[in-house]
Amino acid sequence: LGLSYGMYAVFHLSELTFLNSFLGGIAILSCAFLIDFIVKKNKFQDQHSYSLLMFCVLCNVNQMIFKSPIEILGLLFILLALRRLLSLKSQIDVSKKLFDAGFWVFWAVLCNPTHWLLLLLILVAAVFYAGHHFKYFLLGFLGFACGLILHLATALVFEDTAPNYLNLLPNFDFKIDLRHDLPQLINLYVLIVLGIVLVIFMSSIYIPLKLNQQRNLSLLLILLILYTIYSLFSANFRPINFMFISLGLAFLTGNILQIKGLKLIYKELFLWLMIGLGIFQF
């Protein structure tokens, strides 16, 4: 992943400054570390972090993520929030984890308003793991509000005017527009094919897992669905949205690669096809 980012920076020297390239590289490698940590901590895959492999491949297919360090930072905040939500399966410090998730979501929203959707995911996680306590439904919003107050206070110290947070609200027009340039069309087709593959193997992914693992995988599936619906109906769609969809797909399709009944040749063909598409994007 670091090599791919370095190659992108070399090919796009006119678009990225050295500082942006350095910060983006640190952030993207931090994202990779968190994905590997989440997969191993929740035991989604037995021996290997296939989800991390899929994330690296999808980053190469959708290289828009390399273009903006801010978007990479937003992805990092998403993963920090997901780490707290998926750790709810232990039933330890539930209130603290929901609060922390809401706090990280606020900083993700500052990077891209699309990440408002994660507040809905926090509500779903509260239903899964603390549905009998109504107060837990508010903790994600309290964490979000805490992040907002901290940001507002910092902004007022260093600036004369308060930020306009209304600009961060999502905007919908409910018109599906699939007209994209060739690189984005390739991203779209890849995501569609991966979605179809995921539907085919969904039962094979879920059955071997324990109940709490199934719940966590359901959270990732809901994350994928939320970003997909938003991308279809958003009034200010940007190609980077494909990467947010890819995050959920990376976790879920990574589990397909560990299905024991699937022949090795099919797995290798699948991976080489994805790698080839990534090379083509350069």
Residue spans of the language-model regions?
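Membrane-water interface signatures at transmembrane helix termini and the short loops
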Residues: S203-G261
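Transmembrane-helix signature of polytopic, membrane-embedded enzymes
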Residues: V39-L58
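Juxtamembrane membrane-water interface segments that cap and precede transmembrane helices
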Residues: L3-L13, Y165-I186, L198-M202
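Membrane-interface alpha helices of multi-pass inner-membrane proteins
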Residues: K97-C111, T228
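Transmembrane-helix motifs of polytopic, lipid-linked glycan transferases
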Residues: G25-N42
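Aromatic- and kink-enriched transmembrane "portal" helix at the membrane-lumen/periplasm boundary
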Residues: T17, M54-I72
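Perimembrane helix-loop-helix junctions
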Residues: L118-L142
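Membrane-interface transmembrane helices that cradle and orient dolichyl/undecaprenyl
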Residues: A81-K96
